[in-house]
Amino acid sequence: MGNTVAREDFEWVYTDQPHADRRKEILAKHPEIKALMKPDYNLIWVVMLMVAAQLTAFYLVRDLDWKWVVFWAYVFGSCISHSMTLAIHEISHNSAFGNGRAMWNRWFGIFANLPLGLPYSISFKRYHMDHHRYLGGDGIDVDIPTNFEGWFFCTRFRKFIWIVLQPFFYAIRPLCINPKPITRLEIINLLAQLFFDIVIYYLWGAKSIFYMLAGSVLGLGLHPISGHFIAEHYMFLKGHETYSYYGPLNLLTFNVGYHNEHHDFPNIPGKSLPLVKKIAAEYYDNLPQYNSWIKVLYDFVMDDTISPYSRMKRQLKGEVKQD
């Protein structure tokens, strides 16, 4: 478990990200894909059901023994929580109400955030738009690990710990790489979350709060669904920046595994990304792809050529516009 990864820096590239050019090519050849660029109103009802499911779980765990609270936090709560972060990802792209009602999406994102326990939705939206516009951009794309992460988490054991601690690095990384002024909506997100947490504690006590927070932390750390964090952009094959996953966990994650398709068409809801792949199969079928996020996690830890440094980075040119 002590083998050290030889890579000592990111993979610096001097070309633009591939998604804009591929999008133009696909739309020229398959203009019918434009019909998929519309809201997914079913997302609204799915999110409401997920919030209701977590509220029910908060009530049911309130008097359980602690061992069962921990058990259900990992077995059930972690899945719902991670799935909810990906619903928030969909909402950040205005998939719930459409681009014409952008603020409705922001308020709905704050609502979807409530059963996670920690404010997330508004800040995520701001940084995630940068990730799409400036994929791999040095000092802008906070999906890229810090130099410390690449340098320190360089053995199998340390990479395993890095996976466990993923939620903490995703929370801290923006402050290190690209800090932004706090906005009014972020303050509202924080206050709404604090109020919700206080109400849950008042109604059902510490075990419900623990279940909520533990489910979020565990679901974003050492968990099968968390394989998507690594599968999406870590360079397992030299020269390939984005990878899709076509396995069954897409059913729980709003098709976030269709990641090449998503970056090519970020304004198409996850529900319709399989149709994008079907229509433009000649563009996607031969790209590197995964069928198991668990295997991605295993390979990341055990492959001594892969580390947090295994990301493509680029120096941005021209004016950079951020949210």
UniProtKB/Swiss-Prot annotation:
It comes from Gallus gallus (Chicken). Its EC number is 1.14.19.17, 5.2.1.-. GO terms for cellular component: endoplasmic reticulum membrane. GO terms for biological process: ceramide biosynthetic process; fatty acid biosynthetic process; myelin maintenance. Pfam families: FA_desaturase, Lipid_DES. SMART domains: Lipid_DES. A motif (Histidine box-2) lies at residues 128-132. The gene is DEGS1. Signal peptide: none annotated. Keywords: Endoplasmic reticulum, Fatty acid biosynthesis, Fatty acid metabolism, Isomerase, Lipid biosynthesis, Lipid metabolism, Membrane, Oxidoreductase, Transmembrane, Transmembrane helix. It is found in: Endoplasmic reticulum membrane. A motif (Histidine box-1) lies at residues 89-93. Interacts with RLBP1; the interaction increases synthesis of chromophore-precursors by DEGS1. It catalyses: an N-acylsphinganine + 2 Fe(II)-[cytochrome b5] + O2 + 2 H(+) = an N-acylsphing-4-enine + 2 Fe(III)-[cytochrome b5] + 2 H2O; all-trans-retinol = 11-cis-retinol; all-trans-retinol = 9-cis-retinol; all-trans-retinol = 13-cis-retinol. This is Sphingolipid delta(4)-desaturase DES1. It comes from the Eukaryota. Belongs to the fatty acid desaturase type 1 family. DEGS subfamily.
